[in-house]
Amino acid sequence: MVAPGVFEAVVPDFIWVTEHPIWFSGVRLRARTTVVRLSGGALWVHSPCAPTDDVCAALDALGEVRWIVVPNRFHHLQAPATAARYPNAMVVGPKSAQARNPRVSLTMSADEPEYVRATSELTPIQLGVFLSSMRLSSFTPPLAP
């Protein structure tokens, strides 16, 4: 497990992850936040973790948070606090997330033209009736030396 608040590079300079504990019905689970640097340099934050000072310092060191993505109705808990820390970021997600947590204030849904254009290197994938995610569609990671 990656230490909470520490972003581990999955693909150097492009993709990072951090894991954090969450409690669900008395069971301790791990959740993962993924950060992608888009081709224009903006950061895309998928399923945000709690925006602690350490997390925000790590994100700020990577670049400007432009997109906060609530991927489905289950991964909404830290979106309001993250949006408050990054008020210029767009919050994207399904209406079901906002219905489940009224504090989630969506800027737009993932099918709106502005979001589709800005994140064209990402392709949405449907994982089930209630779950969806994104994958890189036109990304070629640099080859290791």
Regions found by a protein language model. Name each.
Residues A50, G93, Q126-V129, F139-P141:
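Short, structured patches in soluble enzyme cores that scaffold and shape functional sites
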Residues A50-G93:
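Active-site metal-binding motif and surrounding structural segment of the metallo-beta-lactamase
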Residues K95-R135:
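Metallo-beta-lactamase
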Residues S25, D53, F74-Q78, Q98-N101, ...:
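Active-site environment of divalent metal-dependent phosphoester hydrolases
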Residues G40-G41, P87-N88, S120:
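Short coil/turn connectors at secondary-structure junctions
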Residues G5-D54, R135-P145:
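Conserved beta-strand hairpin/beta-sheet module of binuclear metal-dependent hydrolase folds
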Residues M1-A3:
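Basic, glycine/lysine-rich polyanion-binding surfaces/domains
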Residues W16, V69, V92, T123-I125:
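Hydrophobic/aromatic beta-strand patches that form the interior of the parallel beta-sheet core
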